[in-house]
């Protein structure tokens, strides 16, 4: 059970070296910076304004960096929409951007960020303008096409002295009324330009002296004037608009091609964003520091084994300008220490289960090694199948060897790779290979159901016993001996006694074992009552003692919970066998054509459900039946100052 030994340290440095020291610590990725304003030892100095934040323009600088982040992130998002996307598998196989921290810092400082953004922004603006012009031309064409047969422009008609012309539309429903009204005005000439289901385009000519009366009549009929200010005919205007559209389409195509070929610019933006994210992290860390006119104080946590490397690195980088001091931890300090788990390659992936529940406190023990054993058994037993296990192991191994994934995903892949071994091993025990029965099965899932049930309960019994033992051990370490007995060792002995008693009742030859078990359970039940009364120094301890004994029902429930190991394992095996039976009913030709596809599809579903059940129910057994006996969690994760890895991977 490994939790890294942490050491508290403090650095005192000249103010002009602050940015360099923070950059060095960020590259080191080993120091978690403490907030000095939250520490009691520093609060008085801050209140009296003996010390203050080293950056008086902290908020302004942070806001500036945030705006730069937003600009870069927005530009990356917009540019990625044009750069050809690779398929998911190809993108995962692609080697990520790799660079050293120092090179990223130097490149970030030297890069003309504003010019890079302006250059790309200009292309987007050109594209937007071209699309806008094209859309306006298309809209005008759609309105103008119906007037293509108009042989004279409205502006030309305005030059007549003795005639007045009206060009526009009326609703189609008003056509009959128009004809009727025209009879009252024999000097009017009406020409139809176009007709649609909703409106009719007309050209109306009249003498100048009756223009007002004509306009009034047309208005009553819903006449709408055709707004056209060009000297060229509509059909000529349509030709010009078509040319404009083609021109803008060519411009759009060329601009989109330029944006699609901007992969180098996209990489530069990604590198710059990670650089700005690093600057932001360092800027945010300044809020946790204390400063005078010339000096800055920094306190933090670091793994004990890395202290010497820090001393050497600071001396090489800054000479004697930075003072490093190591503090011995007191009992009060241990409550503040962050937790960093440290396990070997086989155990480390199972830290995911522990972290999902809660990290242990620094003064506690890491339960991950024990969790790894039980979770390995639980998951394997609930998904037991050789084929499923080999696929899980092979698939995760291939992904780890072939794909370039982030460290967090790689840890998950290693986790499931180990679980794949457990699934295959239990598949050997059950003799199951993709639902087919193998001749060397140690336990037959169709006939040995009671045996599997007993194994499940025994595994549950061992799990509960382990939890109770760890509970007793934890309380002894805390010097709470009464709790160690009442909540741990006494219940271990009671449950062992009850198990022996049950064995004696079931097997007459073990009658003496049953007698011993009966006394073992009775003596420890009485012991819980006596220890509770003695520790309370009065009969008030009797109530908690009786309530504690009443919890025997919860232990029965815990053991019953472990029957899911049998139930889910048998369910997966039965469903897989049923799928095989369905495929076997097909005629030979169908069996080896569509039957293969159906076999793969059905077993994929069953495999997914088996793994999902194993993952969820395995975690449930750990969290409730195991952790519920001894583990509180509540630890604070160790969070060192680290560089951002949104797009880049750092070379050592």
Model feature map: region roles:
Residues 1-371, 406-409, 413:
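Long, charged N-terminal accessory/stalk domains
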Residues 2-7, 14-30, 308-652:
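Conserved, carboxylate-rich catalytic/transport cores that coordinate ions
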